[in-house]
């Protein structure tokens, strides 16, 4: 048995073209190209209440729509670019549009009527709204052969008239500047008086010193010049309302204050802790900073992780990311210090932190109004003088009265001295003739083994004790020279260049000598 040969079926595109031409069409090809397959019918039924967008669920290509399929968790895939179109290197003439209709026109004679004229100028009379008549002069054509040129008589030389070319004139603008030095140039001005020719000129010499007028320029009835009162230009009529001028920095500060006190966008928080003025970073996070490298006058940036929740030292500074530099200004009669902070409560996948703005402020001290400040008078404006006494009240003395000896009288008892001199803490000063130096020795009572006795290494030195004065002449002690008669208990030796003393050998403490026997 011979098996029949299996022939290959034509492609789907060829079969579809045959179907459109009227050939027999397989049912599957017809349903596919007419979008009548089972999948197409299901999609049409379900699309009445569901929308699949551009997923491309049909019998077409599985390309995923216009943008293609996008994998989950990844970005889109760009399609490949088409082939580059090679442009020709030669110039291509642009062709006009085809099918432009051409309207036929009735042929007329292309003849211009010419009128003969006896010469002269040609006049064109154009009637309004009528045709233009052109009048031209017609000359006979030249005869055949070489033309004959005749220039005057043969004996005369030819004359050629040359007309020079005219060039357009160029505009030239010239400016002159003159600068005079008033130190070396004299300004001369004549008196402009009608009918006067004998008036002398006035010369003004302008230099660094005061000038002198030469000529009839005296004040009075014979004044030549007109005196014009000088006016000041550019001077404000009223002084500024405040001592602080309105500068650009003031405008920036006002704009910054309006931004801080916007309650719809910025949260207002008042801080009473004084650490906010010196170390605001301690209120945000628990950290130890080196004061050598920390400057609180700048903006502060805090590195915090949103995933790791940590409590701030102060609840008002929770989740603060940045703190601006401090701003000091006046607000409602108080000196206020403000800082603008931003929270970082939310973090996106891209790493961006989102949070609201917080305005932290604290008041330092009130500002007293100008009326409450007591002003002092500079200088004396009246005839009264004020004498200030620290131990008594102030006394007003009329300076108009002349003070003399007759007006001031004091009793003799005012000049008496009621104080008794006490020399219980007196010091004994001894002056030697070696270098004229004064040595001060403090005499203390009760030094064992007796009173202090002085040993002076100068025989000419005289010690003069002074006691309280008394009217009793018997108790008066004359000058007595001091000479050591016996060895004193304590010897004080004054040597040159030293201020120490040495004890007598008899007063030194004795040491026990231990004998060692071997």
Swiss-Prot record:
HAMAP family: PPV_L2
Motif (Nuclear localization signal): 1-10, 509-514
Described purpose of this protein according to its UniProt entry: Minor protein of the capsid that localizes along the inner surface of the virion, within the central cavities beneath the L1 pentamers. Plays a role in capsid stabilization through interaction with the major capsid protein L1. Once the virion enters the host cell, L2 escorts the genomic DNA into the nucleus by promoting escape from the endosomal compartments and traffic through the host Golgi network.
Organism: Bovine papillomavirus type 3
Subunit details: Interacts with major capsid protein L1. Interacts with E2; this interaction inhibits E2 transcriptional activity but not the DNA replication function E2. Interacts with host GADD45GIP1. Interacts with host HSPA8; this interaction is required for L2 nuclear translocation. Interacts with host importins KPNB2 and KPNB3. Forms a complex with importin alpha2-beta1 heterodimers via interaction with the importin alpha2 adapter. Interacts with host DYNLT1; this interaction is essential for virus intracellular transport during entry.
One example GO MF annotation: structural molecule activity
Name of the protein this chain belongs to: Minor capsid protein L2
Gene from which the chain derives: L2
Keywords: Capsid protein, Cytoplasmic inwards viral transport, Disulfide bond, DNA-binding, Host endosome, Host Golgi apparatus, Host nucleus, Host-virus interaction, Late protein, Microtubular inwards viral transport, Phosphoprotein, Viral penetration into host nucleus, Virion, Virus entry into host cell
PTM comment text: Highly phosphorylated.
Major localization listed first in the record, in broad terms: virion
Pfam families: Late_protein_L2 (PF00513)
GO CC, any one term: viral capsid
GO biological process: microtubule-dependent intracellular transport of viral material towards nucleus; symbiont entry into host cell; viral penetration into host nucleus
DNA-binding in keyword set: yes
UniProt-annotated location(s): Virion; Host nucleus; Host early endosome; Host Golgi apparatus
Domain of life: Viruses
Membership in a protein family: Belongs to the papillomaviridae L2 protein family.
SS bond list: 19-25
């Amino acid at each position: 048995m011979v098996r029949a040969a299996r022939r290959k079926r034509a492609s789907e595109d060829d079969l579809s073209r045959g179907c459109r031409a009227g050939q027999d069409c397989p049912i599957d090809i017809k349903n596919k190209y007419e979008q009548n397959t089972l999948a197409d019918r299901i999609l049409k039924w379900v699309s009445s209440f569901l929308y699949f967008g551009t997923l491309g669920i049909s019998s077409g290509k599985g390309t995923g729509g216009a943008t293609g399929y996008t994998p989950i968790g990844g970005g889109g895939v760009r399609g490949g670019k088409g082939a580059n179109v090679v442009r020709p290197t030669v110039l291509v003439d642009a062709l006009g549009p085809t099918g432009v209709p051409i309207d036929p026109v009735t042929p007329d004679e292309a003849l211009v009527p010419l009128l003969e004229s006896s010469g002269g100028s040609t006049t064109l009379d154009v009637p309004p709204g009528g045709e233009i008549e052109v009048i031209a002069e017609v000359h006979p054509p030249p005869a055949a052969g070489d033309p004959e040129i005749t220039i005057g008589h043969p004996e005369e030389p030819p004359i050629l008239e040359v007309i020079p070319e005219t060039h357009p004139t160029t505009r030239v603008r010239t400016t002159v500047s003159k600068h005079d030095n008033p130190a070396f140039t004299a300004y001369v001005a004549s008196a402009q008086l009608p009918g006067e020719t004998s008036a002398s000129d006035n010369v003004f010499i302008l230099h660094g010193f005061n000038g002198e007028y030469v000529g009839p320029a005296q004040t009075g009835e014979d004044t030549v010049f007109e005196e014009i009162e000088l006016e000041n230009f550019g001077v404000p009529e009223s002084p500024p309302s405040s001592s602080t001028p309105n500068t650009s920095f003031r405008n920036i500060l006002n704009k910054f204050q309006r931004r801080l006190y916007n309650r719809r966008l910025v949260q207002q928080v008042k801080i009473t802790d004084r650490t906010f003025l010196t170390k605001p970073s301690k209120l945000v996070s628990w950290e130890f900073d080196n004061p050598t490298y920390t400057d609180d006058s700048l903006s502060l940036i805090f590195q915090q992780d949103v995933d790791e929740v940590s409590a701030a030292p102060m609840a008002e500074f929770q989740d603060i990311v940045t703190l601006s530099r401090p701003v000091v200004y006046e607000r409602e009669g108080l000196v206020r210090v403000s800082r603008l902070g931003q929270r970082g409560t939310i973090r996106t996948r891209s790493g961006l932190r989102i949070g609201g703005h917080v305005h932290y402020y604290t008041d330092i001290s009130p500002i007293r109004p100008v009326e409450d400040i007591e002003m002092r008078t500079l200088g004396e404006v009246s005839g009264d003088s004020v004498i200030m006494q620290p131990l008594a009240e102030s006394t007003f003395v009329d300076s108009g009265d002349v003070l003399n000896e007759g007006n001031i009288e004091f009793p003799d008892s005012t000049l008496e001295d009621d104080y008794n001199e006490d020399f219980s803490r007196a010091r004994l000063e001894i002056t030697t003739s070696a270098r004229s130096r004064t040595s001060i020795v403090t005499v203390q009572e009760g030094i064992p083994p007796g009173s202090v006795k002085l040993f002076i290494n100068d025989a000419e030195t005289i010690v003069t004790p002074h006691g309280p004065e008394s009217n009793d002449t018997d108790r008066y002690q004359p000058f007595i020279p001091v000479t050591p008669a016996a060895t004193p208990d304590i010897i004080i030796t004054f040597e040159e260049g030293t201020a120490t003393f040495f004890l007598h050998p008899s007063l030194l403490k004795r040491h026990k000598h231990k004998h060692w026997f071997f």
